[in-house]
A protein has these predicted regions:
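Bacterial N-terminal signal peptides
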Residues: 7-17
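Active-site neighborhood of glycoside hydrolase catalytic domains
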Residues: 279-280, 284-389, 396-405
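Short beta-strand-plus-loop segments that form exposed binding edges in beta-rich domains
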Residues: 716-725, 733
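Surface-exposed loop/turn motifs at beta-strand-loop junctions within extracellular Ig-like
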Residues: 109, 582-586, 679, 719-721
């Protein structure tokens, strides 16, 4: 069979000639790229597909090139783009051959052809007019077969069109797995025909604390991208405003087909036995007490049958071999007092509540196996006695041993740790580098066989605080591009991967500009939250993207497109509070920082002579408090010594510490202090709170400056990890006037 699609590249196509050296901006980086001679014109093309299995790919390519294509015979001087399979190639491997007048995309399977199309798309520019692509040959394949992204549609709902636009972005960068989180406490989003109440009553909700938080932050920051999307709201039969939505099974099948056309498989997640408050609100008999609960009653045969009935319909909609059952963060307290759960334990010889969850997970595993599906669950299921056909998804970054334990048992693992692959977390240029430096198979202690059990990597985007498509794009991009690079490339030199990516990033941001994607701009650099100066100061921030604009205000208002642009150094002659914002080329705002400039007032050195090197570290029991002031309330475990503000190796639990001692400033000068922590921290100098990074939060860096006279200054740092899940604390001091100078610590 031959299908030929003539495509006229009109206004949707991009207007500049792409030369051979520009092929070097392709992300992910190809394994091999050989430059040819000349160019291939793409004003008019035909797509030649002789394999019926590739017809969806041909349609996808035609849509990518023009957005409008009709089936007809070739003619004139059209460039032929041929799609073909070659079984000698590996899964997802492809070759892209470009010569004058014709382009060949050959894949080891459908996924390989889709990856070749993605590479061709990146060779196309982004404005109307005649286009050419360089003649070349690319031979390419991924390192990891699983290159995924999680989308949470329960906390905030995403329309079919929004999901498809996200799939388009994934396809551009060769991500091939969408993990679709469809059910949670906040909303049931998938039509289950056997239980119509689940969407009839469970798809909409009144505003919850997350919605209110989004609204408050949007008002505070004057950022409409943070507001709850009004298109997802309605007035219910009681006259109340509610939020939500759901997908019909027909819509879901349409999205599945759309994804598969682009080489993407969708793994559905219906989360049991925890995260089930919406299900038990609609069907109270599912819980232990017959009332709304986040946990199902696993002692009830009816509950287990309910789960299987739901999965029957899920499996019928989603053909992918992997189905996610959740299994995380289960509140088991109800099971302790539930007669049915206690009876289940007696009948099955289960000794503990933890064992009861293991029994439930194994029941679902047997069910999935009978259906020809692989069970996937969060890393809490790693020790539930599952077979090697089930997959563990590592998410708890502090639970570092789970990958080794699961792979020793012969289970496959998907790596999506909180440490770098939670895309709902705050981001900066450092988070990009953390993704690029992370290589799951390089986990310490894994044998070669264990390494091969790691399926790949996935970025998780939980949407409690993400309520609009614009904000979703901001949280995901460009981190998703970094994930695509790391999951594809076999280059084991981390620093080379980082440097190469940052060279390519500006070209990728230009592509996102053309697609009207609200990505996060690179960090605003060259400014501190607090800056001291003598005589006069200079404000001169920078951003690593030439098409971005920095604007500022000095009256406390949020900068707009009409605010003054920073095109050079801004002289500061009096105490001033700056608000600086970065703007994309389309005028939309990305990020804001504040910078307070003040005349330096030197802190005198103390008349002390400390004798012992390092800082005294008071290690306390973690009280569960959420402020640094709670640290001292915990019992003292030990007194230790650290050479600087860093956690001593002995501290591997109860991350609740106070550093005390003295800092020696080697010269009069302005010193910049930086405190990076997860969770709360504070830094005091001579009894004055210099940095306040307090409260529960993910990794945040705070900076401040102090003018110090030469000599000793009292220093105190407080730090706690709210969840006691690993401890993240980094602290630095540098002399602004002479960075070569080093401070020392004694007590």
């Amino acid at each position: 069979m031959t299908m030929r699609l003539p495509v006229l590249l009109l206004a949707a196509v991009l207007c500049l000639v792409v030369h051979a050296h520009e092929a070097a901006t392709i992300v992910p980086t190809p394994v091999q790229l050989i430059e040819g001679t000349g160019t291939c014109k793409l004003d008019t093309v035909t797509v030649d597909c002789r394999d019926a299995a590739l017809l969806p790919a041909a349609q996808y390519l035609a849509q990518s090139l023009a957005g409008r294509a009709t089936v007809a015979a070739t003619g004139g001087r059209a460039t032929s783009v041929k799609l073909a399979l070659d079984t000698t190639l590996e899964a997802s491997q492809y070759r892209l051959d470009i010569a004058p007048g014709h382009i060949d995309i050959t894949g080891g399977d459908y996924s390989g052809v889709a990856c070749g199309i993605a590479t061709l798309r990146q060779l196309l520019p982004a404005a109307s007019g005649s286009i050419e692509v360089p003649c070349l040959r690319i031979t390419d394949k991924p390192r990891y077969g699983w290159r995924g992204l999680l989308l949470d549609s329960s906390r905030h709902f995403w329309s079919v069109d929004e999901v498809k636009r996200l799939l388009d972005l994934m396809a551009c960068y060769k991500l091939n797995r969408l993990h679709w989180h469809l059910v949670d406490d906040e909303g049931w989003r998938i039509e289950i025909k056997r239980y119509p109440q689940l969407t009839g009553q469970g798809a909409f909700r009144p505003f919850d604390s997350h919605d209110l938080g989004c609204e408050e932050r949007a008002a505070r920051e004057h950022n409409a991208d943070l507001r709850v999307d009004r298109a997802k709201m309605k007035v219910d039969e009681h006259g109340d405003s509610v939020y939500g939505g759901y997908y019909t099974q027909r819509q879901l099948r349409d999205v599945v087909a759309y994804a598969r056309e682009r080489g993407i498989e969708i793994m559905p997640e219906v989360d049991f036995p925890g995260h089930s408050r919406m299900a038990t609100t609609v069907l109270p008999w599912l819980s232990c007490q017959g009332e709304p609960s986040s946990t199902l009653c696993v002692g009830s045969d009816a509950t287990l049958q309910f789960c299987k009935n739901v999965y029957d319909e899920v499996i019928d909609i989603f053909p992918f071999a992997y189905v996610h059952m959740g299994g995380d963060e289960v509140d088991k307290r109800n099971w302790q007092s539930c007669p049915r759960c206690r009876q289940r334990m007696r009948q099955c010889g289960i000794a503990s509540i933890e064992g009861l969850q293991g029994w439930f997970v194994r029941q679902l595993e047997a069910y999935f196996n009978a259906k020809g599906r692989h069970l996937v669950g969060w890393d809490e299921i790693a020790d539930d006695g599952l077979g090697t056909g089930s997959v563990v998804q590592w998410w708890r970054g502090w639970n570092k041993g789970v990958v080794e334990r699961a792979t020793v048992q012969g289970k496959q693992v998907i790596c999506s740790p909180t440490t770098c692959l939670y895309f709902d977390y705050g981001q900066d240029d450092g988070t990009i580098d953390e993704i690029l430096r992370y290589d799951p198979r390089s986990t310490a202690g894994l044998s070669a066989g264990q390494q091969q059990l790691i399926l790949g990597m996935q970025g998780n985007t939980w949407c409690e605080w993400i309520a609009t498509e614009a904000r979703l794009q901001y949280q995901v991009m460009p981190r998703m591009i970094a994930l695509a690079e790391r999951a594809w490339t076999s280059d084991t030199c981390r620093e080379r991967v980082v440097a190469r990516f940052h060279e390519k990033l500006p070209a990728q941001l230009e592509r996102l500009d053309a697609l009207h994607v609200r990505y996060k701009l690179p960090d605003i650099t060259g400014v501190s939250e607090h800056t001291l100066y003598t005589g006069h100061g200079v404000l001169w921030p920078a951003i690593a993207y030439g098409k971005a604009t920095l604007r500022y205000t000095t009256d406390g208002t949020v900068p707009t497109c009409q605010s003054p642009a920073i095109t050079g150094p801004v002289e500061v002659t009096r105490d001033t509070h700056f608000t600086i914002a970065s703007f994309r080329p389309d005028g939309s705002r990305s990020d804001m920082v504040t910078a307070t400039y003040a005349q330096a007032r030197y802190m005198p050195a103390l008349d002390v002579t400390p004798k012992t090197d390092g800082l005294l570290v008071e290690w306390h029991r973690n009280t569960g408090g959420d402020h640094c002031s709670d640290i001292a309330q915990g019992a003292l475990i030990a007194r230790l010594v650290s050479p600087a503000v860093q956690l001593p190796p002995a501290i591997d639990h109860d991350y609740s510490v106070i550093f005390k001692g003295y800092l020696y400033a080697p010269a009069d000068g302005i010193y910049e202090f930086a405190l990076d922590s997860d969770d709360g921290s504070q830094w005091l100098i001579d009894g004055t709170l210099l940095i306040d990074n307090d409260g529960p939060h993910s990794t945040i860096v705070r900076r401040n400056q102090a003018a110090l006279r030469q000599g000793w200054h009292a220093t105190e740092v407080h730090y706690f990890d709210y969840n006691d899940n690993g401890g993240t604390l980094h602290a630095t001091v540098r002399c602004v006037d002479n960075p070569a100078l080093q401070v020392t610590y004694k007590h």
